[in-house]
Every structure is written in C-alpha cells, then in structure tokens.
Amino acid sequence: MIIVSGVYSSGKTTLAKNLAKYFHSKAHIVESRQTDNPLYDKAKGTISCSYDEDFLMERMKQIGEAMTEPYTVFDRSVYEDVLRMKISADLGFLDQEEAEDYFAWINKRLSKIPLDRSNEASQILLFLDLPFHDMIDRIYQVPKVKEYIMTHPFLYEYYQKAHLRYREWFENYHYSEKLRINALDYDFNNMDNVAKVAKQIEEIYQNPKFEITYDAIVDNMRQSLVNNNSI
C-alpha cells in the first residue's frame, strides 16, 4: 500500500494517479472537497466533523481491502485528517474536544480493520515536500483561492501552521517505510519522472523494516494531536 501525503499543492493526486498507472494498480483518489480547505467555512460557524465521516467510512473500507496490495495507491491518509482537525482547533476554528472526538471516531473504525493481514504486503508513506513560498505560489495559481486568502488573513496563518506541522509530523513518523520527495525536483505529469519515484519505492520494498500494527497507527494519529509550542 502506497500512501501519498505532503504539504498542500505538492502534487499528491497527480503522483498517486500516475504511480497507479505505472504499477498497473488501483488508485483511491480524494476529490477536491470542503475538508481540503477546512477554514473556508469560518463565516458559516464551526467546522463540522460529520462532513468527513462518509469519506472516512469509505476510506476505512478501502484500507482494509488494500492491506495485502503493496502497490495500491492512496492520495491522502487518515493521519492528515486528524492533523488538519487539530490545527483548526489550535487556531480556534473548532473546539479541542471536537478534534479529540474525531480521533476517537477514527480509532474505533481502525480497530475493525484486520491489520494482521498487512504483514503480507509492504507499505510506504511518501511525503511530498515544498518550501512554504513555493506552496503558497502554487495555491495562488487558482485566482479565486488567492483572492479568498488575501481577504481572509486567518487562512494564510492556517497554511503557515499546516506547512510546519506537516513537516514535523513526517519527521516524527516511524510506523512504516517512508520516503521524502522534493516536489520541486519532479514533474509528476511526466511518466519518466514518476518512474524515478517508483524505482525508489521498489528499492525500499526489497528490504522492509516495519510491520504495521493497530497500536502503531493509533500512536501516530495521537502524535498529530500533540501541541508543539515551537510552532
């Protein structure tokens, strides 16, 4: 199972689709939706966790099915969902209890996935990294989004915090194989570039060092909820 994570606008969906094409495997893609930009609903009140539940129910089902498939690709992880909720709570856009409830909701459903089957196949977390200014430049390429951020300064603050927290989260991630990719070094629309990433994945798969367990996954998500006062 290949999980493509990373900072905003780093090319996660494009790479996920093309990795699946390269490996002739299945890709589970999250379409652009409200939860990708959680603070955009500030004017409407608090952020609701319920919007994500349908997505997560489907995603949990997909994870269970992909446990024995080393090249099934996901373009978003449940870890990042917990992290986004925590960042939003830290900025005051929803209650801390709501973020905790969200974690508990995911935890409950993860406990029903037969993770013992995961030992039959390798798993890897890719992290697509970008410097903050490059990330913002890419986000600003969508005129409506740029206008919205320019007129709602809290969004810029959110992206700053998210960029730092995503990087910190990946540095502390040690629950499966992982690989950092500098998104500026690759064109994920170019299959030759995609092949370079794929070959790195294959090399790591040849010498796996981790077994995925329920406790490890839950511990990683719990780390997403930990405040870091330096950020």
Q: Over which residues does each language-model region extend?
A:
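A glycine- and Lys/Arg-enriched "phosphate-lid" helix/loop adjacent to the NTP-binding pocket
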Residues: R84-R165
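NTP-dependent small-molecule kinase module
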Residues: Y140-I231
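Conserved substrate/cofactor phosphate-moiety recognition/catalytic segment
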Residues: K21-M67, L83-I87
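Conserved lysine of the Walker
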Residues: K12
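Hydrophobic anchor at the beta1->P-loop junction of P-loop NTPases
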Residues: V4
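P-loop (Walker A) phosphate-binding loop of NTP-binding proteins
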Residues: V7
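A basic- and aromatic-enriched beta-loop-alpha substructure that forms the phosphate/nucleotide-
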Residues: R59-Y102
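Hydrophobic positions on the alpha1 helix immediately C-terminal to the Walker A/P-loop
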Residues: L15, L19
